[in-house]
Amino acid sequence: MMKKILMILALMGTLTVEAQRMDDVTEHSKYIKVVDEYVPAPGQYVNLMPTFETGDTPATMAQKCTEMLANNEKGLVSLGGYGGFITFHLDHSIANVEGQADVMILGNLSGEGNSEPGIIMVSKDENGNGLPDDTWYELKGSADVDSVGKVVYGYSITYHRPVSETHTGETGGISKYITILNYILWTDNQGGSGYLYRIADSLNPIFRGDPYYPMWITDDQMTFGLQTLLPPNGYNTGDYKKEYWVRNSLAWGYVDNKQNGNTAACSYDFDNAVEVVSRTPVKVDFVDFIRVYTAVNQQCGWIAETSTEITGAEDLHLDTSIQRIKDALAGVESIKKETTINGELYDLQGRKIKAPGKGLYIKNGKKYIIK
């Protein structure tokens, strides 16, 4: 019987090797190592942060993002309008530590009333190929609780390349900053449609007349989905003479939603992982890839589209992540002594243990260490 248990254990240990990643480096870093994907939706900053240059491709733009964000460089990357996303990984899997926030992701919120919320997705490299092509789960936020009936799950949007970059001129009134009103057409899977408008380059000194559609994308359409659409958070509190836009922060759970100095509000717990559409909770032990996307589809006067920005991310418990990876590679799962364990436990001599204390045990062919 014991030989059978150990054989099952050995097989399980082999399978778990591919699911945890730890690069061969002298010293592990808690910061981003590589940006795997950068696919922004159209927006006023997408060809500027990072800067597009003739000849750039999806790969070179992702590399530019890496140079701006890796190793805590604190550069600024814009994700454009709704759905635009960035995917990154560290030099190791991030462990899900029970009862604690696991990752901090920073935006560029300048103050209250300027929230541009982004949703976080997480994935585990289950097939072991080092690519972000496995199942993705969402980290739910406060809108699941306080905006019931206002959130759209399974939302999809398609942007169409503009037919012209020719400015139509100032339109007057509350839209006096708009130079192309019907600029970039969007359609969604809810029967909705509309246009991103273009604002005057004079509004921002960094503008250089670039298109809002990503210039390295060769397709004439960009589709993002199936994702979650948060309700609008932007309101014009001014009048017809002067706009004053406020974009209210959500309670918790979103990137670029609170100021970076608020560490707790910029920290996120893998225990909040859910399936995107059904919202079924998912237990995630390790995360290899993280994705952030702009979660609202709105335009706010002279501010134009709401676009999530990213300035960095870090593992909030580096040492624990590394130790748990080592345990997993050895076929050992760490659990707390107070954790309820369903099923029978055996010690390494094959004896059934009714009241386990701290130590190493076997359950269903897998090793557990109780700390």
Predicted regions mapped to residue ranges:
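Acidic, glycine-anchored loop motifs typical of Ca2+
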Residues: 126-135, 151
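C-terminal tail/sorting-segment detector
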Residues: 360-371
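Residue-level detector of functionally pivotal "anchor" positions at catalytic/ligand-binding pockets or at interdomain
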Residues: 322-349
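Predominantly extracellular/luminal cell-surface or secreted proteins
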Residues: 121-125
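Exposed beta-strand and adjacent loop surfaces of beta-rich binding modules
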Residues: 117-119, 342
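Bacterial Sec-dependent N-terminal signal peptides
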Residues: 1-20, 332
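A domain-level signal for the mature, folded cores of soluble proteins
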Residues: 20-116, 140-328
